[in-house]
């Protein structure tokens, strides 16, 4: 007989998990492995709430493996380190992001692109290197191989810094890879949510001119006066869209809803790049004419490897970049998920795990 989540490993842990596609989260007792020779045990202080968490607890993508304990934007304190651990010591403040394992021997891993490893393990809703299920950061603690633990910079706040472990690297990695970092160039950010608002801040830190592209004019003042964008373009205004044709060098498309790509491609200059980060539930139509006639590129990107994620954290610390957050208690998570589904958050929920998670 298979062991239950609570008896599978020797160390009892408490968290909140979803049992089925209703997505309702409730108190959940499970267990974690002993701290191994290469492991770091992390007492979780804060955990960001990512849109992926919402998709996963509701099985929107069809691969949820219940019960699910979500959470991959984790900041905490190292409480145990294995004898082979050289990067961390007890008491260090650390982060754990989207991935917690990879094969370490494939071409992607050799290039510090563990996030593209065919055997990559997600921090939750996946099978770990020991053959048992991974549970995420909506919990007391987590045990992770040191290679997938990040040093959290001293001047980066634990709460508002937590979302950088997913949202931050998701926008930083494509900007670096696709060469979207040349000061003075014009970056469009399509969608002003959890990813988009961080993209604005990182773009400005690279010295880019940043325009937020949105269907909602109500976000204009906040985008410019609060987040620091240079301009705001409303996609429902035909005159302004026409005037903006051919003005942008790059566009980061963070929109997760089904939307038209043709208008965005029209905003790009010759040789412009449109990089998609959102994951709409249905395929998008990709028109060929603007690509061919303007020698334009459409690409994608998925988080980043460990080396680049550490680089991103250090960059954000240097430039005082954090996420705009709403701090919540653990027992407020279901309400937060309902609001997240309606895009009713500015711009990321973060759970105060250490001060609000307690067994019933």
From Swiss-Prot:
Keyword entries, A-Z: Lignin biosynthesis, Metal-binding, NADP, Oxidoreductase, Zinc
Gene3D superfamilies in the cross-refs: Medium-chain alcohol dehydrogenases, catalytic domain (3.90.180.10), NAD(P)-binding Rossmann-like Domain (3.40.50.720)
Gene Ontology biological-process entries: lignin biosynthetic process
UniProt-listed Enzyme Commission number(s): 1.1.1.195
Highest taxon of source: Eukaryota
Cofactor: Zn(2+)
Reaction equation(s) it catalyzes: (E)-cinnamyl alcohol + NADP(+) = (E)-cinnamaldehyde + NADPH + H(+)
Residues annotated to bind NADP(+): 52, 170, 191-196, 214-219, 254, 278, 301-303
Cofactor annotation remark: Binds 2 Zn(2+) ions per subunit.
Binding positions for Zn(2+) 1 per the UniProt entry: 50, 72-73, 166
Tissue distribution of the protein: Expressed in the vasculature of the primary root and elongation regions. Expressed in the hypocotyl, cotyledon veins, vasculature of the first rosette leaves, and hydathodes. In stems, expressed in the vascular cambium, interfascicular cambium, developing xylem, and phloem. Expressed in the entire floral organs at late developing stage, and in the abscission, style and stigmatic regions of siliques and seed funicules.
Family: Belongs to the zinc-containing alcohol dehydrogenase family.
Quaternary context: Homodimer.
Protein name (database record): Probable cinnamyl alcohol dehydrogenase 9
